[in-house]
């Protein structure tokens, strides 16, 4: 281990090598053509980066920590002769490094089983229903939740199971409802159980999580690639809508932006912004507004739509609000607005099962017509998915 391990550029490595050969600031500056003050700043920056990882020999710090951690404190024990005989290193998560590692894992998930970047999928020659849109609604999926059946009384659930279940459900629904011009993959929020590597919700509530964050992000990247590619085989255009939930409001942002980057050169894929927790689209005379459903009651949902989407309301005659959060289906009609929450595919975790919560598990696809609003729908239950 040396300072060379903490250099990011050839210039930094050159300076460190000369410094380790015994050259001072002035001689190094003369040899490589920069000021002695620049040499000093380079070395201080490299030493600071190394010390943050636990490496600073001049301070008897030689026990390093992993790349995604920072040293919080070091306790060194010396003998009577003043020589170090033991050391205790305290570390803490480096959030910036964890984010960088997470993004690298996400990118790896995209490129898994792909030679190079995204390869366009051949569009269907025609679709039977140019005036229709198939909305594939993913209720709170809690992809990386951990549920153990002896404890919860329901099915097991982990990252691998969640991935397999969703791929099967979407495949069955696309096979049944894929003759529409547009397919909209709508994630109604809480796709991830935890918001970060702390294994907590955004509010700080600890949750039972399966898998390290990097692995989960890699799986999420690959999973959405598979789902959208499957939809592109049948629909001429695919929309991706990621609603931000209460479990994963920040994770949903990076998920959305990474998908936008991945499909940047695919004109058949449209990724909706999700900077706001409210997202909407118009399909002919149909208005659809989406929100996770957290921290807002039915009456407030209705008031928000009529107030904030007044122009869209005036242009349409069929208006819907889709939300998740409560893990089961409810339907309410209020003042010309149809409000509906959708079911989920995941079982309840230990906390919710102990509190008596649970519901029928399913995923739905709603067919919307430009002129007539909701035309029909398809649903696949968990038993059919697992069959």
Role assignments for model-derived ranges:
Residues 23, 46, 204, 380-381:
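Peripheral, non-catalytic segments of secretory and membrane proteins
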Residues 1-160, 178-179:
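Acidic, histidine-bearing metal-coordination/catalytic regions of metal-dependent phosphoesterases
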Residues 232, 259-277, 282-289, 294-387:
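Conserved beta-sheet core of the metallophosphoesterase superfamily
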Residues 20, 165, 273:
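Short, glycine/acidic-rich beta->alpha junctions
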Residues 121-141, 149-269:
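Core catalytic region of metal-dependent phosphoesterases/phosphodiesterases
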